[in-house]
Swiss-Prot record:
This enzyme's EC code(s): 4.6.1.17
Record GO terms (molecular function): cyclic pyranopterin monophosphate synthase activity
One GO biological process term: Mo-molybdopterin cofactor biosynthetic process
Entry keyword annotation includes ATP-binding: no
Gene name in the database record: moaC
Quaternary data: Homohexamer; trimer of dimers.
Family, as annotated: Belongs to the MoaC family.
Full protein name: Probable cyclic pyranopterin monophosphate synthase
Pathway participation: Cofactor biosynthesis; molybdopterin biosynthesis
Pfam families, per database record: MoaC
Lineage: Archaea, Methanobacteriati, Thermoplasmatota, Thermoplasmata, Thermoplasmatales
SUPFAM superfamilies: Molybdenum cofactor biosynthesis protein C, MoaC
Length: 150
């Protein structure tokens, strides 16, 4: 957060609180691409496991990507995947005990995992002109945010 003068918010007087945030988002893909992911037949490797690692890395590096985000201690990152007929849904939950929220880390985790999925399967998604008519990322949002006094 920033104050009205454009400075990073001073959180030094805030209490340390247990916090959790969960975000979700989807990437829509061709049915054939979903089948390739399910059968671990993507050239670049295991899409789910690599995307789990990328999502975790994005969560941990949020403060480096968003200038006014605080560098907070991340105590947990859980990245889950659900494959539908024409989509992969990524859900990321992040936890901390700190003075500010952890929802940006959860959102960043989802975005990183989704971007990685796109990168890994783009050769399967391109049409004859090199475009991606069916591929899209949608619905990235926070579905739950909690905090409780320790």
């Amino acid at each position: 957060m920033i104050d009205f003068d454009g400075n990073m918010i001073n959180i030094s007087r805030k209490d340390v609180v247990a916090r959790k945030a969960t975000a979700v988002g989807r990437i829509y893909l061709r049915k054939e691409t979903i089948t390739a992911i399910k059968n671990n037949q993507v050239k670049k490797g295991n899409v789910i496991e690599i995307s789990r690692a990328v999502g975790t890395m994005y969560a941990k590096n949020t403060f480096l990507q968003i200038p006014y985000c605080h560098n907070i201690p991340i105590e947990g990152v859980d990245v889950d995947f659900s494959l539908g007929e024409n989509y992969v849904e990524v859900t990321c939950s992040t936890t901390t005990s700190y003075k500010t929220g952890i929802e940006m880390e959860a959102i960043n985790c989802v975005n990183g995992a989704l971007l990685n999925i796109w990168d890994m399967v783009k050769y399967l998604e391109k049409d004859e002109t090199g475009n991606y008519p069916e591929t899209r990322i949608e619905g990235v949002h926070v579905i739950k945010k909690t905090k409780s006094q320790e």
